[in-house]
């Protein structure tokens, strides 16, 4: 990776020149190591010579303690408050890249600090306060919209019925320690002690214990920590854990953990998005799909599909993101498919690295996407400009992937009910190919699920955008809980071809926060919240 350095040339002008050193010449392996930064020396040098203008560019302010922007959850419109002049309000763009303004970037090759006294004031401040997150109850007859988080009795506000199964689901990107250290520039606003795993894990475990969700969908679960700390701790809380590590040399993966007192495990279905025989799919992201059966005092109960994923981050590779999503949806369709054409309820969680209103997000909710003429950098809504980017190819993925434009496996075997000699011939006849659009070069993607988002992504009363991640370079929404909602006299959507058995009713959700809220406690991570993501939590009702 080429880096940029600042060079002073005549009249105090600063131009960008290519440096021959990597941006991170000494990888940060321990957060206890001293940090050094030539930026502050350069800043003082320029200030003394009245050439501070050489360090300015659109979007830059002199009070900023760092001069460049990041690569992880990048958003030009989201910066810590001390990057803004007084009175400047954060503008949450309408998730369209053509609404974003261009900005010049200057990168320095070193960005670490020498000692505590060199830390910015915002970093040295201790924020002992916490922000209370409220439950938002969504039952139509509920007179009270929200209650304090400490009030755990959700059922008291909702309709009480015998033929029901209520359960809660949490989605939480817990921030892999290796990824934190490899991307330490994203956490320069943090005090170093709060970044140590020995400090973070007890906080994360405390959150999990407090919320006491029936199902956990965790992302960025580091393999070594999972085996030695995370899994044993969760098992002691009554969870059964399933884990899928990313392929290649990636240190983390996804886990789905459920209370074995509430569910039985029917199947585990990992999904590897990397396919060595397909050049497009050279990334190591994964998904994990579980089929669970509620433990209820009935002879038979409908199963529930829980899916968890962490899609590729790269804002300019929307083609890979869409293909990864299609692979996950195909596996979900395969797991939930029934002979009568119905599908069991689905809860799909994860870090989708896409913003609300983006083409990828809209595809999940609407069940269809026409990607003709769409630039690959606009798929996730993270990229500000499509200049220099190619248009998505038609089709996006090659035929040998084995997934149709309807996001199902092109050939799948329908399992027979009984294994008898007379069924041998029948089993061969039951091999059926899922119908695929006759137009093999169609630019239309579809999927057969009617999915809704647990969150509306805006604060109801003010319209201020909610965020699920907040660090030194970004404050946006990338984490979601999608579910197949119970249809109650609603218009048929793109996923109407799937007849839901029961469906899910959203009872309550744990409120999210705004960027302004989070910076009152110095962003994420902080003394009380030990990931750069907020946990998402929802309570559902399965009507039997």
From Swiss-Prot:
SUPFAM superfamilies xref list: DNase I-like
Signal peptide positions (record): none
Listed Gene3D superfamilies? Endonuclease/exonuclease/phosphatase (3.60.10.10)
GO MF term set: catalytic activity; mRNA 3'-UTR binding
* Domain of life per record: Eukaryota
Which BP terms in the Gene Ontology apply to this protein? 3'-UTR-mediated mRNA stabilization; mitochondrial mRNA 3'-end processing; negative regulation of mitotic cell cycle
Cite the PANTHER family for this sequence.
CARBON CATABOLITE REPRESSOR PROTEIN 4 (PTHR12121), PROTEIN ANGEL HOMOLOG 2 (PTHR12121:SF27)
Q: What is this protein's name?
A: Protein angel homolog 2
């Amino acid at each position: 990776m080429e880096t940029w350095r600042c060079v002073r040339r005549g009249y105090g002008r600063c131009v960008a020149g290519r440096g021959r050193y990597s941006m991170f010449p000494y990888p940060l392996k321990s957060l206890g190591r001293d940090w050094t930064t030539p930026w502050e020396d350069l800043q003082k040098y320029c200030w003394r010579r009245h050439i501070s203008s050489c360090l300015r560019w659109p979007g830059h302010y002199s009070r900023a303690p760092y001069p460049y922007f990041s690569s992880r959850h990048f958003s030009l419109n989201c910066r810590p408050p001390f990057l803004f002049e007084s009175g400047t309000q954060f503008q949450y763009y309408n998730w369209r890249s053509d609404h974003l303004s261009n900005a010049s970037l200057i990168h320095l090759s070193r960005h670490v600090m020498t000692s505590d006294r060199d830390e910015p004031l915002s970093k040295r401040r201790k924020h002992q306060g916490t922000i209370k997150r409220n439950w938002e109850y969504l039952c139509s007859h509920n007179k009270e919209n929200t209650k304090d988080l400490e009030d755990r009795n959700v059922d008291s506000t909702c309709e009480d019925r015998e033929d029901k199964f209520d359960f809660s689901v949490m989605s939480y990107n817990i921030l892999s320690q290796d990824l934190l250290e490899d991307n330490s520039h994203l956490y320069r606003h943090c005090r170093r002690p709060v970044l140590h795993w020995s400090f973070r894990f007890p906080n994360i475990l405390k959150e999990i214990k407090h919320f006491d969700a029936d199902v956990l969908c965790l992302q960025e679960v580091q393999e070594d920590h999972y085996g030695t700390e995370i899994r044993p701790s969760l098992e002691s809380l009554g969870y059964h854990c399933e884990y899928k590590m990313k392929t290649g040399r990636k240190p983390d993966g996804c886990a789905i953990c459920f209370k074995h007192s509430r569910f039985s495990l029917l199947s585990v279905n990992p999904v590897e998005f990397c396919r060595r025989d397909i050049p497009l799919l050279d990334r190591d992201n994964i998904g994990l799909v579980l089929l669970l059966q509620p433990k209820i005092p009935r002879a038979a109960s409908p199963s529930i599909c829980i899916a968890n994923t962490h899609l590729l981050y790269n804002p300019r590779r929307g083609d890979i993101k869409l293909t990864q999503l299609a692979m996950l949806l195909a596996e979900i369709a395969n797991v939930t498919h029934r002979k009568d054409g119905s599908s069991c309820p689905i809860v799909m969680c994860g870090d989708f690295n896409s913003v609300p209103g983006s083409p990828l997000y809209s595809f999940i909710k609407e069940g269809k996407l026409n990607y003709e003429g769409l630039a690959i950098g606009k798929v996730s809504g993270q990229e500000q400009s499509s200049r220099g980017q190619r248009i998505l190819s038609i089709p996006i993925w090659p035929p040998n992937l084995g997934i149709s434009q309807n996001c199902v496996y092109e050939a799948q075997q329908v399992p027979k009910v009984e294994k008898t000699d007379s069924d041998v011939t029948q089993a061969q006849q039951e091999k059926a190919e899922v119908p695929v659009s006759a137009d093999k070069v169609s630019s239309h993607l579809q999927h057969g699920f009617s999915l809704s988002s647990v969150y509306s992504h805006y604060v109801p009363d003010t319209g201020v955008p909610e965020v699920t991640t907040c660090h030194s370079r970004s404050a946006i929404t990338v984490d979601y809980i999608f579910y197949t909602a119970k249809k109650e006299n609603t218009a048929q959507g793109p996923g109407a071809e799937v007849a839901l058995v029961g469906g899910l009713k959203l009872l309550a959700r744990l409120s999210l926060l705004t960027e302004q809220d989070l910076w009152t406690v110095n962003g994420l991570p902080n003394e009380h919240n030990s990931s750069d993501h907020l946990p998402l939590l929802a309570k559902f009702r399965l009507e039997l």
